[in-house]
């Protein structure tokens, strides 16, 4: 700049900025810290985290996505890895911790290459090619899953180490039965399996319901508490007189007009109840409100009614009973009604529930999940949701892989062979990708109190003979995971590797960060960030 010229500012005052290597270093640091946070939770011997929010509410879990969701993370690069975990949870239901620690390790390996002088673009290209090759290798080592026994093994593997050890076989039975029941044309909608979590009893008292359970009671205590041979009407229409949609006013000039007006309203409600009765319905689930007078008339007709039922519950009742949701009560006919053998209200512990049972081939069902305390029941529910996700994935794809770190070691071994066929610096990136994948067996060993280096060396040697060799964290031996029954859906590994690679690639391609005013911390916080302080913000952009 020539002498005497004024500097030109193109960004608002107090905006912070990092450029080039500094931006990459900060983002990689954030990714590594986040991965280290959840790393200790991986595997059957993984530890739990206690998360306490500003209100003092406690969550105790080793579920990766739950930990990341509950943490107050605002660092942009760390948020990208949280999205990886959420995507993994939505797509598969398990493997969230695996996805995050692989992404963190990919960034760690990339940092070494950047320090060696390898350009981030070359690393990103190498990672992309390595991820594609990893998917091919995964297909080669996958096994076909076609029977109930395989589904049981998948469910048990998913729940091992998640607080459900004492009853994992029983819970696996419930999960497999539930998923197989709701399957339609080879597809499973996990929303059709409803888990009702109730504390106050042993997990062994959990059971599956051949129908739906909703956490609602009768709209009026004078209504029947139990209905046999239920004929079910589902209404989106409120059973009450609608308010005027305009600001129009009704002017009454004498008391008789007021009386006529009231009588007219009552007649409209009587007509609605009569419409329900004439359709043959003896149970009504209404998504909207029900007028007190309507409740009186329904009760007098011996009809059970529940009001303000959640939309998700209405959908499940449709799937379970064959009922059709009616948006206008005048259109309600006998053809719209669903059927159930019995509907009854029951109080369990401190919750009043309505059971819709003995449904004919229901495509939506409920699981009553018990737990001795609130926190135990919550962790059981997370384990059950993971198991439902992996069993559904297995049933849809019919492809599984061995567990215990076996797929990662085998993919890493073959990626190194693939790297030898590539020339240039991209070869280093593919080799780094292979090294990063071995973080999974290393972490499994560390969390079990074993020597990770010895375990990894033994695993590599064992994989010269078989691709199914993995680590048995309970006795520390290298065993055939296929024979041991430790198996996972192929989709879990596929999604984890793909998501981790894409997230790492995206972070590596960032060479400029501009933070708005107020989104900044002092440089001394960078040391805190290494120990998980400072994850709420970004180090300064000089």
From Swiss-Prot:
The keyword ATP-binding applies. One of its GO terms (molecular function) is ATP-dependent protein folding chaperone. SUPFAM superfamilies: GroEL apical domain-like (SSF52029), GroEL equatorial domain-like (SSF48592), GroEL-intermediate domain like (SSF54849). Keywords: ATP-binding, Chaperone, Nucleotide-binding. The keyword Nucleus does not apply. Belongs to the TCP-1 chaperonin family. Molecular chaperone; binds unfolded polypeptides in vitro, and has a weak ATPase activity. This is Thermosome subunit alpha. It comes from Methanothermobacter thermautotrophicus (strain ATCC 29096 / DSM 1053 / JCM 10044 / NBRC 100330 / Delta H). The gene is thsA.
